Amino acid sequence: MASKSDKQVTVEVKNNNNGRNRSRSRARSQSRGRGKSVKITVNSRSRGRRQNGRDKYQSNQRVRNIVTKQLRKQGVTGPKPAICQRATATLGTIGSNTSGTTEIEACILLNPVLVKDATGSTQFGPVQALGAQYSMWKLKYLNVKLTSMVGASAVNGTVVRVSLNPTSTPSSTSWSGLGARKHLDVTVGKNAVFKLKPADLGGPRDGWWLTNTNDNASDTLGPSVEIHTLGMTMSSYKNEQFTGGLFLVELASEWCFTGYAANPNLVNLEKSTDKQVNVTFEGSNGTPLIMKVPEASHFARTAVARSSLPTTLARAGQNTTSDTVWQVLNTAVSAAELVTPPPFNWLVKGGWWFVKLIAGRARTGTRSFYVYPSYQDALSNKPALCTGSAPSGMRSRAAVMTTLQFTQMNQPSLGHGEMTATLGRAIPSPGDTFNVVLTIGQPLAPNTLTKQSWLNKTTVSPQNHHVVKIAKDVNNYTTMQGFTPISSVDWYTTDFQPSEEPTPIPGLQVLVNSSKKADVYAIQQYLNNQTNNKVQLTSIFLVKVTTSFQVNNYLSYFYRSYGTGTTVENLKVRSDTTAQDVNFPVGWYLMTNTAIFNAPAPPGWIWQNVELLNDTAYLIDQGMMHLIMPPPANTQLLFEMRTSVTGSRSMISSEEPDTHEPGDEWCDALDASDSRVFLEETDYEDEEDEDEDDEADRFDLHSSYGSEPEDDDENNRVTLLSTLINQGMTVERATRITKRAFPTSADKTKRSVYMDLLASGLSPGNAWSHACEEARIMGTNQMPNVSGDRGHAE
């Protein structure tokens, strides 16, 4: 290059403006769309003799360094790399071809924060960590390594093609079209390496790409590598299709980064695989193309958990969408099996697309996503619009089971945090009240849509059979009467924002012969005055059967008979019963119980266990509306329900003999919270205790630890409780303060015995049982049973 003494190397940098002048205020950025011609002059040192090989190399290297320095000084090569990182990323396996046609097996996006394996985690390596710290990236080289997982003679019938997609945009590409790209054909059973140079990988900003995937798609994604297969994969040893993996895919490259700009949340982008998911597409003329997947699928649950939903409402007839974009890759079934409304059949046939979660919940147990033909369209919220509906003969086809690989493309919030805060969604906590929308399922035999609803009438069952009990413990339970199957449950907050499904209510369960069959998720009670001295209580329970079971019960139904003239009789229960089997498969059910007892009803949750009465008028209250006739399938019921039981107590029906013994209410099963309260109590009161005592002291009441007789304490308890409730205090808090101010003899005895037995080494359960027995003896002067709280001092 500089072998002669008079040799000059000329590199000149000029701006090519195509003869157009621009003012300084309108000058374009040097990093975009400007042609450059380069001219640099280098004078070599004169030498008196011919250069040998070493001198020639040094001279060439000197010239090369000078040229590189001058080019960088003129801004032709963009910013200097701040750090470079070599890494080998394992991306997963290439599966076999199942249809015989062109199938996509992998789509590898080269942005460093997106280069992850599909293991379902957010773990990251050095490349992802650097991508979250720097604003620009580029590749020095890229090698896609395919390591064979089968022998050359083990399978046949399939060829693999690795190709470069410079725009990272889905396209309608045939096998011949893939051959028009830069590509490499690979024979199954042999290792291969697809090599790409910087000229194939350069970005729009002097070879650099932006790292933040929230920016323009054409500046951030970089090129992508797609891997397709053609021809059905057959086993050479068996006359059957081969379904295993063909290649292990690894990415060996050197990423360079520059421009420090920390976006730590970019390392948490998730990539995973849902191997068994039903996918359907919907759309009509002029409406966006919608992809639907089951609400319980891994993809739907992940998208809901990691998507940010706006709280603003959309215009009429429109839906709001999440800000999070997902790339979806279909790798399991032929695109011909997925029925798609026109004109975007090619998009689904291509095997990968982009989606965004639609806010709210579908009412069929599915999650809906808008489909986008490119990442830029997804960022701009321009979904694919259909020009028609799917062919009428294909609309009734069942959903196709497939495998979806999905990648979280962006993170709306780039600051610290494992995941974005999901706006408009609430994570329920115990005690929350929810609006619950129940979608009715098919009637449960023997019920039909054309006849009255059968329900269990009695609290006993035929011989060798058992009733269904919704129970807190052996003393607090109710018998199931009505049973309505539910196909899906939608949870909303009190202001009707979509919410996650809560956990089952601790301590509540559905029992058959002391065996747990279901969990209880939500409850509610409706109390109405039935007559002047009677009240009607209807309890509803939303339960999820975890183990299918069958019961045989005495069934009856409600009926309404017409009187003379314009008078109409109230709802009554048929006195005759029929013993019938009822099967409960796994799933959701709404169970009910209605009871009539003497007024007044105490506050708190009431456990009643009486059978439906003959010749007694029942009111059609809020919890019984669906028990007259079975509601049609897919209709919906709305209830405001609770997710905890507080202040519960048992009631003895006036129709049953009173076998209640003094002290019974103090001997429920010991809960973990009871034990914790006792153990945390000391001789020194904490700040909360002092506040409660102060509230009690304001009423100038005396402690029961003094010399006042027990009957005076009883009057004081009633007075204080009524005063606190009238002042607007909750029943639970008023009861707690009253018990602390005037504990009963049973309270004192139970607490003392319990603490003594614990100190002696007895287990909490046994200590509680013995304390209850002592409290039973001392329970002659008990506090009025205003709630189901335990009888200990709090």
Swiss-Prot record:
Residues 73-265 are annotated as: Inner core. Residues 681-697 have a biased composition (Acidic residues). One of its GO terms (biological process) is clathrin-dependent endocytosis of virus by host cell. Residues 396-425 are annotated as: Core attachment. Residues 650-794 are annotated as: Acidic. Residues 1-72 are annotated as: Basic. The keyword Membrane does not apply. GO terms for cellular component: host extracellular space; T=3 icosahedral viral capsid. Residues 21-37 have a biased composition (Basic residues). It comes from the Viruses. Pfam families: Astro_capsid_N, Astro_capsid_p. The record marks 315-316, 395-396, 425-426, 649-650, 658-659 as: Cleavage. Keywords: Capsid protein, Clathrin-mediated endocytosis of virus by host, T=3 icosahedral capsid protein, Viral penetration into host cytoplasm, Virion, Virus endocytosis by host, Virus entry into host cell. Residues 1-59, 681-715 are annotated as: Disordered. Residues 426-649 are annotated as: P2 globular domain. Coiled coil: none annotated. Belongs to the astroviridae capsid polyprotein family. This is Capsid polyprotein VP90. It comes from Human astrovirus-3 (HAstV-3).
